[in-house]
């Protein structure tokens, strides 16, 4: 019975996925994922990216966000990206494959950033979802806390942070923590984010001293 339910659920997901207008547009444009549109909407409202910036992309694969940011920061900009999964190369993106939760991977990522600070840290990280919020939300919150730690280490004063967060236990505390570190904080739900998803994007600008 469980197998039948899972099969029906998977079929619904596939049907929804392929009928999604953003998935269709991504395929037509040759984009790596529909996530490209989410970041485009955020950029239109918040103007995070400018030519020549250095950006850290966490949870980068398959590369939708990096693919978008390259068009905004130009040839003199730089992206340092990391994901547990492999990612096909993108010109202008320095990709590190590894588990961001691993201290050695974090160290390697910091070495790639080097001594100079970055202007934007962005995280689209999410754990493998079990479908049980009591399990999934704490896992997701752990990842976004790590992303915020990365901000503390590498983000320049006045820099920006954009992070995918799933609403649930710990969300309000996390939002308060970000507000203590940045001068302006917005919670965005892009049109290209599925309505039934718990995901929202926190956009924080103006890192405080």
Curated annotation (Swiss-Prot):
Please name one Pfam family that this protein belongs to: FtsJ
Which reactions appear under catalytic activity for this entry?
A: uridine(2552) in 23S rRNA + S-adenosyl-L-methionine = 2'-O-methyluridine(2552) in 23S rRNA + S-adenosyl-L-homocysteine + H(+)
**Chain positions recorded as S-adenosyl-L-methionine binding sites:** 63, 65, 83, 99, 124
Ordered alphabetically, the record's keywords are: Cytoplasm, Methyltransferase, rRNA processing, S-adenosyl-L-methionine, Transferase
Gene3D superfamilies according to UniProt: Vaccinia Virus protein VP39
Enumerate the active-site residues. Answer: 164
Where's it mainly located?
cytoplasm
- Provide the protein's localization: Cytoplasm
Cellular component GO terms, alphabetical:
cytoplasm
Record GO terms (molecular function): rRNA (uridine-2'-O-)-methyltransferase activity
Per the UniProt entry, the Enzyme Commission number(s) are: 2.1.1.166
Membership in a protein family? Belongs to the class I-like SAM-binding methyltransferase superfamily. RNA methyltransferase RlmE family.
Please give the function described in this protein's UniProt entry. Answer: Specifically methylates the uridine in position 2552 of 23S rRNA at the 2'-O position of the ribose in the fully assembled 50S ribosomal subunit.
**Protein name (record):** Ribosomal RNA large subunit methyltransferase E
Q: Which organism is it from?
A: Shigella dysenteriae serotype 1 (strain Sd197)
């Amino acid at each position: 019975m469980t197998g039948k339910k899972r099969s029906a659920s998977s079929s619904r997901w596939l049907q929804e996925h392929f009928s999604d207008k953003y998935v269709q547009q991504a395929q037509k444009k040759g984009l790596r994922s529909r996530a490209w549109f989410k970041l485009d909407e955020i950029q239109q409202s918040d103007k995070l990216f400018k030519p020549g910036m250095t950006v850290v992309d966490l949870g980068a694969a398959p590369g939708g966000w990096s693919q978008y940011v390259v068009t905004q920061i130009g040839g003199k900009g730089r992206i340092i990206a990391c994901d547990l999964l492999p990612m096909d190369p993108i010109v202008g993106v320095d990709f590190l494959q590894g588990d961001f939760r691993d201290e050695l991977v974090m160290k390697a990522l910091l070495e790639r950033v080097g001594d100079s600070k970055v202007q934007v840290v962005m995280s689209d990280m999410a754990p493998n979802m079990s479908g049980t919020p009591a399990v999934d939300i704490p896992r997701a919150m752990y990842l976004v806390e790590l992303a915020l730690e990365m901000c503390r280490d590498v983000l320049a004063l006045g820099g920006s942070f954009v992070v995918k967060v799933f609403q649930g236990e710990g969300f309000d505390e996390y939002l308060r923590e970000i507000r203590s570190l940045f001068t302006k904080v917005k919670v965005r739900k892009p049109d290209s984010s599925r309505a039934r998803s718990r995901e929202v994007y926190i956009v924080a600008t103006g890192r405080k001293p």
